[in-house]
Amino acid sequence: MNIMRTAMLLAFMTALFMGVGYLIGGSNGMVIALLMAGGLNFFSYWNSDKIVLNMYGARKVDQHSSPVYYKIVSDLAQRASLPQPKVYIIDSAQPNAFATGRNPQNAAVAASTGLLEQLSAEEVAGVMAHELAHIEHRDTLTMTLTATIAGAISMLGNFAFFMGGQRNSSEHSHGAGALGGLIALFVAPFAAMLVQMAISRTREYAADRRGAEICGNPLWLASALSKIAGGGHTVYNEEAEHNPATAHMFIINPLKGEGADSLFSTHPATANRIAALRRQAEEMKGAMPKSMGWSEEENFHKKNSNLDYDGLNRSAQTSIFGNQENNAVQRIKKRPSWLRYEDSKRSRS
């Protein structure tokens, strides 16, 4: 069902791209846009990992340059029966991570220096297990394709607005060209953003659940999410701000503003994600390990090695996320009932 839904959403984005092409150049513009969409998808398929990793200046590490981080990823990949992905570090103070690649055999995971410095080994494992779940579900290809098309739609929207104004002034079309340009400039990128959200939100819940199964303890990921959400949006991520079409690839929305809990965000509310993970932990009960020994390795952040499980169990009701997260919970409660139902339905799936 998810595969069919994703295929339909990608088809809609391609049709939207063609519609913008039509506003620019009529039927010829529509055909050119279709060819461009095909070319972009083909290029993204073969180069998705290189595009994003180069964009964020990621540097590759191995068992010698970053032994504990690499071992965590390697151990989790074995537990998930996945090929060993390439492992990267991004020099950014904002705690965050993402996965990329066209398939499990050509995948890569990347974590920021901020994430590795602020999280315990078990919390890093929860985050990496989430990213490996995206690789296992082949979400990385879908997310890269949607980012590419959404970015192209925004670019064409700006071009269509400029061309529409030119046609209006030169052909005296009584505003038709300018109106079409306005539609392309504002409506098309907004619609593309909604499609990105529809793809990303559902997949984040699924990756959370599967990631918790891979690492063995849902509270590791829940604790990591609370720390990332609590401090991540106070740190400016210049690359993400310049490339907002890639925001949905991160475990937490890297953009400033209302962030990951906005109604128009690519990510579900962090409080909802943590609540779902807490329910999953209750289902697993005594079967969860509290440590896998990674914290005992040299050169990792031993000061963060103990998770506050009691504090985490109160996280959805207290101020652990700061004012931003509390406001997010209030916005969720004020949403229309049908939207709250959709969120709760996804968290249970």
UniProtKB/Swiss-Prot annotation:
Cofactor mode of binding and number, as noted: Binds 1 zinc ion per subunit.
Localization per record: Cell inner membrane
Membrane-spanning intervals of the chain: 6-26, 27-47, 145-165, 175-195
Active-site residue list: E131
Bias type Basic and acidic residues, positions: 340-349
Cofactor field: Zn(2+)
EC assignment: 3.4.24.-
Topological relation to the membrane, as annotated: Multi-pass membrane protein
Residues engaged in binding Zn(2+): H130, H134, E204
Molecular function as annotated in GO: metalloendopeptidase activity; zinc ion binding
Keyword line: Cell inner membrane, Cell membrane, Hydrolase, Membrane, Metal-binding, Metalloprotease, Protease, Transmembrane, Transmembrane helix, Zinc
Top EC category: hydrolase
Primary location class: membrane
Coiled coil region boundaries: none
UniProt keyword Amino-acid biosynthesis present: no
Feature: compositional bias, Polar residues: 320-329
Stretches the record annotates as Disordered: 320-349
Protein family membership: Belongs to the peptidase M48B family.
Full protein name: Protease HtpX homolog
Gene this protein is translated from: htpX
